[in-house]
């Protein structure tokens, strides 16, 4: 067996070179339809495994996924073969490290700060939620995914980004095309063609909005970045807005749909959540149970040992937070939705320098505003046919319909 010397954390070791096993059976379609049985098997049999169809080495245990995301010196966000670059037509802050990443992230941080959310955005969010709920017909069966989850997320995002001129339909379409492109690990040309169309439409709108936001500064992310004392380049401002559109619709939309499904299929838990008014707890459990962003990739900067296997420099590892959130070492019966499980931190918002900047917005809009208002309006809402709810997604996942009866 071949041997080589590998330097890890300034210690030089000598050992046989064992590469991770290869899974050449699992397909992207398998992962899109239902990845959870696959991840459960991987955690037990091969927690470090190279999945040939995705061309990446999967890490499925919580310790490993957090370790990778917390250590950008060894695991870079700059995945050279990521479909995110063609999907967004940019090298976005999601694929940058160090000072470059920090500068672009901080450029819009003020718009997402907890004080700005509480003082400025929360009252707007409440008005939006009430306006959209006013449209719902009591007593009817309604697809909340189509009528509420997506549109409310889009309208809230339009305000905080400063793109209110875009319709809900446009923002939802752009977001879906961006994330379909970013998760296009099969490199299907038609998905990039659709994201190209979305980029062209967004660029046209953004060009029209630059003058408005420069002449009338406001708390939106667009205006905040444009009017900063040392602004980042306009191309990166556009890229930041696109990243926010990509994640800012699907994350709260899919989180809300997942939480509603979990509560409505566990009525005893729902009643206890209502009694305790612990909507924030329900929010966190929903994100743990089905992470809206299921996986993240990192470029390995130096030969590294993980669980006895060499992950070589230049390899791309994929941290599967969807699997980490159900890891038996962290969560008892992690496959089940249980609002009242013992507290353990999930990884749905990431970890380390790339921790999701919109985490507090999502907690506020979904956990603190939408859930209590929705169940106050429709306290006896039911999901009459849970088996009709469909779930999709490998990189990004959630229900794609949610037919409930409003009572």
UniProtKB/Swiss-Prot annotation:
One of its GO terms (molecular function) is heme binding. Its cofactor is heme. Keywords: Heme, Iron, Metal-binding, Monooxygenase, Oxidoreductase, Plasmid. The keyword Nuclease does not apply. The keyword Metal-binding applies. Induction: Transcriptionally activated in the presence of wounded plant tissue and by plant phenolic compounds, such as acetosyringone. Its EC number is 1.14.-.-. Heme binds at residue 356. InterPro entries: Cyt_P450, Cyt_P450_B, Cyt_P450_CS, Cyt_P450_sf. Belongs to the cytochrome P450 family. PANTHER family: CYTOCHROME P450 YJIB-RELATED, P450, PUTATIVE (EUROFUNG)-RELATED. Not essential for virulence, but may be involved in the detoxification of plant protective agents at the site of wounding. This is Cytochrome P450-pinF2, plant-inducible. It comes from Rhizobium radiobacter.
């Amino acid at each position: 067996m071949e041997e080589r010397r590998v330097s890890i954390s300034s210690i030089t070791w000598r050992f046989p070179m064992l590469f991770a096993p290869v899974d050449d059976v699992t397909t992207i379609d398998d992962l899109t339809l239902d990845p959870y049985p696959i991840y459960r098997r991987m955690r037990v049999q091969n927690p470090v495994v190279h999945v040939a169809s995705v061309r990446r080495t999967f890490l499925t245990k919580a310790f490993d996924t957090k370790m990778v995301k917390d250590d950008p010196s060894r695991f870079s966000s700059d995945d050279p073969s990521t479909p995110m670059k063609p999907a967004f037509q940019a090298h976005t802050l999601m694929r940058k490290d160090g000072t470059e990443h920090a500068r672009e992230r901080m450029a819009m941080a003020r718009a997402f700060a907890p004080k700005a959310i509480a003082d400025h955005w929360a009252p707007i969010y409440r008005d939006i939620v009430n306006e959209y709920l006013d449209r719902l017909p009591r007593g009817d069966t309604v697809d909340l995914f189509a009528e509420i989850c997506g549109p409310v997320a889009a309208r809230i995002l339009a305000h905080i980004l400063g793109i209110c001129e875009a319709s809900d339909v446009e923002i939802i379409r752009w977001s879906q095309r961006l994330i379909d492109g970013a998760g296009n690990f099969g490199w299907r040309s038609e998905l990039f063609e659709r994201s190209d169309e979305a980029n062209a439409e967004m660029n046209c709108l953004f060009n029209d909005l630059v003058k408005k936001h420069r002449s009338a500064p406001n708390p939106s992310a667009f205006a905040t970045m444009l009017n900063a004392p040392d602004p980042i380049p306009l191309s990166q401002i556009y890229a930041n807005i696109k990243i926010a559109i990509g994640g800012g619709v699907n994350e709260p939309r899919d989180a809300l749909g997942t939480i509603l499904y979990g509560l409505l299929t566990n009525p005893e838990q729902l009643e206890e959540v209502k009694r305790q008014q612990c909507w924030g707890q329900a929010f966190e459990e929903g994100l743990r149970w089905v992470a809206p962003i299921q996986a993240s990739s990192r470029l390995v900067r130096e030969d590294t040992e993980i669980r006895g296997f060499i992950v070589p420099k230049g390899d791309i590892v994929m941290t599967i937070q969807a699997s980490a959130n159900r890891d038996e070492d962290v969560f008892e019966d992690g496959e089940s939705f249980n609002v009242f499980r013992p507290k353990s931190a999930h990884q749905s918002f990431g970890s380390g320098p790339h921790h999701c900047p919109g985490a507090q917005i999502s907690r506020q809009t979904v956990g603190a505003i939408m859930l209590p208002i929705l169940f106050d309006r429709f306290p006896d809402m039911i999901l009459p046919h849970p088996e009709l709810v469909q779930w999709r997604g490998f990189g990004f996942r959630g229900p794609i319909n949610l037919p409930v009866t409003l009572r």
